[in-house]
From Swiss-Prot:
Basic and acidic residues: compositionally biased ranges: 53-62
Source organism of this protein record: Mycoplasmopsis fermentans (Mycoplasma fermentans)
MF annotations from Gene Ontology: structural constituent of ribosome
PROSITE patterns from the UniProt entry: RIBOSOMAL_L35
Name of this protein: Large ribosomal subunit protein bL35
Family indicated by similarity: Belongs to the bacterial ribosomal protein bL35 family.
The entry's keywords: Ribonucleoprotein, Ribosomal protein
Pfam families: Ribosomal_L35p
Residue ranges of the region described as Disordered: 25-62
InterPro entries per record: Ribosomal_bL35, Ribosomal_bL35-like, Ribosomal_bL35_CS, Ribosomal_bL35_sf
Gene Ontology BP, a term: translation
Amino acid sequence: MPKMKTKSALKKRIKITGTGKIMREQAYRSHLSQNKTTKQKRQARKSVQMHSSDVKRFKALI
């Protein structure tokens, strides 16, 4: 059976660290930012680790 192709949409949105963790950007940043607090906007800049319940599913798509 041939290899599965990598999902391009996912490839653009995640980054795999050297230790194998999957990192993603946070949501709620693109628009309507005037209604959000400075703290919310600052914390949304950081990348976060993908939740453990999603990791297995996403690794199959990569």
